[in-house]
Amino acid sequence: MSRYHTFTAADAVEYARQFGQVADPQALVTADEIGDGNLNLVFKIRDTAGISRVIVKQALPYVRCVGESWPLTLDRARIEAETLLTHSQFCPQHTVKVLHHDAELAVMVQEDLSDHHIWRHELIQGNYYPQAAEQLGEYLAQTLFHTSDFYQSAQAKKAAVSRYTNPELCQITEDLFFTDPYIDHERNNFDPVLLPEVLSLRQDKALKLAVASLKHRFLSQAEALLHGDIHSGSIFVADGRLKTIDAEFGFYGPIGFDIGTALGNLLLNYCGLPGLAGPRDAAAGREQRLKDVQTVWQTFAARFLALSQEKAQDPALATEGYAAQFLQHVWRDAIGYCGSELIRRTIGLAHVADLDSIDDEEMRRACQRHALSLGRALILVAPHVDDVGGVVARIRQSPSSLTPQRC
C-alpha cells in the first residue's frame, strides 16, 4: 500500500523537522505554500523568528487546475531529485542543494534560497548580475559533459538513460515545443491580432520541416542528462551567485536543447525590453542580452572543450579535434531549439512575463511579433550557422529578421 498522501502545511513542517538538517528542528513552526500549486506543492518552512529555513516540495498526481482528467506520474519527483543530485555532484555551486528525498511520498527537502532572486524578474526589472551568464555557461558545461559519452562509460550511460526515462514530462515538451504552435490546438494561447503571423508559421513548409528535425533529435538523441526546463524562471541569482532549480523535466536528450532553451529566454527578454523600459535603458539592456548570449555559449564551449581534453574517457571520442567538431553540431541544435522556445513562449500554452507583462497593448504586440519572426529566423538559419558572433551581429543589424546564409 502506497504511503503517498498530499501534504498539508502541518505535514510539511513535521517533515522538515525530520529531514531539514537544521540545528534545532523544533524551531521550525510554520509553512507558507508558494507557487501556483498546479503541478507541485511548495512550502517555505519558517522558524520561530519567521525566517525561512528550508523548502519542502511535493509532486501532485495530476494538474490541479484541470483535475484528475490530466494525471501526472509521481515518479517525476524522483527524477527531479536525482537529476539535481547528479548535477550537484558535478556543479554544486550552481545547483540547488537537495537535503532529502522520498520517492514514494514524491517529496524532497531543499536548501532555502530566500537570499536569491528569480532571474527572470531581475531581467524584467533591469537589474543586471554580471556573473550570471558566465556561471550559467559553466553549469551547462559541467553537467552536460559529465553525463555524456565523453565522460561516462557506455555501460553506465545506458543504465542512466533507462533510469532517467521521463515519458510523461517529455510528452509535454514534445507537444508544447514542436507540435502545438504549428497546428490549430486548444492549448495555444495568443492575441487574436497575431493570427496572420500564426497562420504564416503553420503554412511555412520549410519551417515545419526544420521543426520536425528538431523534434526528431529531441526524441532520439540521448546525449546527456538535461535539466530539461532551464529557463530564466528556474534560475535564482544573487550577487556573485547562481543556482538552478526545478529539474522535473530531466532526461537524457540532445545537449543543444538545454543550451537553446537558456539562450531563448535571454532573447525573449531582448524582444520584450522595448516595452519594459524607456528607449535608452531598453537599448542598453538589449545590447547586454546579446552579450549574455555570447557569454553563455562561449563559456559553455570553452569549458566543455577543456573538460574533454582533460577527462574524456573513450579513446575514440578523445581523438584530437573531435570535441570541437561535436560542439559545432551542438551549436546548430542550440540555435534551432532557441528559436523553438521563442515561438512556443509567444503563442503556445506557457507564456513569459518578459512579453505578457508589457502594459502598452500595441507595444506588447510588436514585441510578440518580433519574438515570432526572430524565432522563425533562428530555426531556419540554424543549419548554416558557424558561430555565436555571426548570429549576434545579424540580430544587431536586422533586429526582426535573419536570412539563412552562412554566418
UniProtKB/Swiss-Prot annotation:
The keyword Ribosomal protein is assigned to this record: no
EC identifiers of the protein: 2.7.1.100
InterPro entries tied to this protein: Aminoglycoside_PTrfase, Kinase-like_dom_sf, Methylthioribose_kinase
Positions bound to substrate: D229, R344
Keyword Ribonucleoprotein appears in the UniProt entry: no
BP term (GO), one: L-methionine salvage from methylthioadenosine
Swiss-Prot/TrEMBL keywords: Amino-acid biosynthesis, ATP-binding, Kinase, Methionine biosynthesis, Nucleotide-binding, Transferase
Catalytic reaction equation(s): 5-(methylsulfanyl)-D-ribose + ATP = 5-(methylsulfanyl)-alpha-D-ribose 1-phosphate + ADP + H(+)
GO MF terms, alphabetically ordered: ATP binding; S-methyl-5-thioribose kinase activity
Residues engaged in binding ATP: N40, K57, E111, D112, L113, D246, A247, E248
Pfam families in the cross-refs: APH
Pathway the protein takes part in: Amino-acid biosynthesis; L-methionine biosynthesis via salvage pathway; S-methyl-5-thio-alpha-D-ribose 1-phosphate from S-methyl-5'-thioadenosine (hydrolase route): step 2/2
Homology family: Belongs to the methylthioribose kinase family.
Alphabetized HAMAP family for the sequence: Salvage_MtnK
Free-text function comment from the UniProt entry: Catalyzes the phosphorylation of methylthioribose into methylthioribose-1-phosphate.
Record text on subunit structure and interactions: Homodimer.
Protein name: Methylthioribose kinase
Species this chain originates from: Yersinia pseudotuberculosis serotype O:1b (strain IP 31758)
